[in-house]
Amino acid sequence: DRMLEVEGGIFVAGTGFGKTVLALALINALKVPTLILVPSLTLIKQWVQRIQEHMGLLAEQIGVCAVTRDRLTGILDVASPRKLGKKEPKKLEASLSNYGLLIVDECHHAAAGSYVEILRSYAGKYLYGLTATPKRRDGKMPAVRMLIGNEIDKASVELVDYKVVKAVMSSSSKPLCPDAPYVLQVDDLVADMQRTQLVTSSVIDLVRRGRRILVLTERVEHMKILFKALQGSCDQFVMLTSDMKPKQRQAVLTKFAGISAG
């Protein structure tokens, strides 16, 4: 309701709140041609799927501008800012003139060049941003607010109804040098096979006890080492890395969704 009271601004809600469903309800309420800016192909596919599920549209009724696709209907479209922002200024303005509502998903990214060009060229009535992260490490969030508007509402959600226990283990077989560059410290951790064995054995033990485990690491190389060590112990382990091709990524996400549903 708060979003309908104003013509633009940023809605902040935690992961799992249902920002996509909220945005679709907004689209349905305003009943104007809508463009949704989404930062990645994976999220674009998720948006298209949610639109089909909640609005009863067929895939071909939803315009998509991303990677190799460039088909905007001017009615309800989902676009990658990187792809859309490559249009010549006049063509970009002409495309944007079709819309009365612009929704920027993950709007904390909107200080980037392609977003700026699009947002400056948009002249429609309604402009909303969605984010779970209303802060940027580089301090550019004020620029995002200048482009989209101030925070209009904030919601939180507890994804779990139990306390989170944070356990920190000393898992390295050799002491790290605190004065060494961070990159070198990570190199040592990745190469520490005793540490890898400790991590993977803990994961396997928890899986056998019926737990669901998410392992995060910032290096693709490290993830591949961990995944290789886990293979053979359980057929439900999946690996998702930044260097995967789109079809590989989609296959992994499909398998992951099946595991989560089970």
Where is each model-derived feature located?
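Conserved helicase ATPase core of P-loop NTP-dependent helicases/translocases
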Residues: 45, 60-73, 89-91, 214-216, ...
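Conserved helix/coil segment N-terminal to the catalytic DExD/H
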Residues: 66-101, 112-117
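Loop/turn-to-beta-strand initiation segments
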Residues: 33, 73-76, 98-101, 123-129, ...
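Conserved pre-motif I regulatory segment
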Residues: 1-12
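Conserved interdomain hinge at the start of the Helicase C-terminal
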Residues: 26-27, 176-229
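Conserved Walker A/P-loop ATP-binding site and its immediately adjacent core
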Residues: 15-53, 136, 218-223
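Post-DEXD/H (motif II) to motif III coupling segment of the RecA-like Helicase ATP-binding lobe
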Residues: 100-101, 106-166
